[in-house]
């Protein structure tokens, strides 16, 4: 056991949690003790997500969570984010340049154009509405809960 900041940490529990996260996010590594810097970029991204969820946040801010991850692993990561939102009630605020990705998992999508909120749209809104919002030409901010 380690004493860090006057808390007791159980090394076996930490290792088991690491193994669970490795399986959950399909992190390709030789062992749980392999240095993260020795992993591929995509697996490093998954480790970042695993670390963030280990803290059991109520709100999680993620930016480009699938950057550097292969197509098959993208779906796994996105499904994991959705599952943590639904099962654990974690609010996830995500930034991404991948509109299709956002539309596939988000309840609402805020469009920022030239540093200003242009619109808040539903993923089912039309491509034309998204285009206008991204161009900063949307007439009003739509907030629909």
What are these regions (language model features)?
Residues 75-87:
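Helical segment within the ABC ATPase nucleotide-binding domain
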Residues 54-58:
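A short, proline-enriched helix->beta-strand linker immediately N-terminal to the Walker B motif
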Residues 108, 120:
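Short, glycine/charged-rich "phosphate-handling" switch motifs in NTP-dependent
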Residues 60-64:
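Catalytic Walker B motif of ABC-type/P-loop ATPase nucleotide-binding domains
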Residues 102-104:
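A short, surface-exposed alpha-helical micro-motif characterized by mixed small hydrophobic
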Residues 49:
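Hydrophobic anchor residue at the start of the ABC signature
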Residues 1-39, 127-138:
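Conserved P-loop NTPase catalytic core
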């Amino acid at each position: 056991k380690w004493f860090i900041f006057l808390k007791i940490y159980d090394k076996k529990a930490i290792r088991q949690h690491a193994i669970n996260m490795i399986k959950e996010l399909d992190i390709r590594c030789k062992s749980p003790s392999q240095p993260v810097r020795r992993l591929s970029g995509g697996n490093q991204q998954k480790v970042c997500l695993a670390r963030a969820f280990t803290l059991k946040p109520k709100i999680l801010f993620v930016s480009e969570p699938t950057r550097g991850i292969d197509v098959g692993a993208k779906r796994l990561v996105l499904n994991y984010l959705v599952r943590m939102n639904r099962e654990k009630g974690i609010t996830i605020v995500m930034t991404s340049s991948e509109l299709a990705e956002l539309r596939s998992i988000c309840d609402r999508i805020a469009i920022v154009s030239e540093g200003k909120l242009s619109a808040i749209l539903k993923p089912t809104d039309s491509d034309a509405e998204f285009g206008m919002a991204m161009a900063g030409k949307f007439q009003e901010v739509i907030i629909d809960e």
